[in-house]
Amino acid sequence: MRTVTPSKPTNILLVEDNPGDAALISDAFDQVADDVRVHTVSDGAEAMSYLSDHRETGSFPDLLLLDLNVPRVHGLDLLESLQEESELTTLPVIVLTYSEDESDIAESYDRRANAYLTKPNDHDEYVSLARAVDEFWVRTAQLPTAA
């Protein structure tokens, strides 16, 4: 079981193509947690490459924040690909997107997303979201270690 200790930062992989949203998310986590590191990639293909590069060391991120509408490999396709990789099936994925479309929500959960959140409208709401993610996914939830 994965536990977070003060000496080991929590690593979040953020898949986000909008630089403004990426900055807001990273800044929000910086404000709420000293021990959370956000690494940003701008599309689904880059996310798969990042995860593939980390396969040899087994140093996968602790959490993946995923915008659905990213270029090259759509977020839903990325979710499906994660389930095809045995080492990645336990990686917690939170979809963080502007879409409130019922089919996007249903398809995300069908493809094993752990949560579906709609992006906030302002900085303070991003900070509240980061605090909630940190408190639940980083500090409270008991998660399996990567295979």
Functional labels for PLM-detected ranges:
Residues M1-L13, D17-D34, D124-A147:
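Non-catalytic signal-transmission and effector/linker regions of two-component phosphorelay proteins
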Residues T40-L63:
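Acidic, metal-coordinating helix/loop segments flanking the phosphotransfer/catalytic sites
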Residues S59-D62, E87-P92:
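His-Asp phosphorelay/catalytic-motif detector in bacterial-type signaling
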Residues L66-L68, T97:
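Active-site residues of response regulator receiver
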Residues P71, D101:
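The feature encodes the CheY-like receiver
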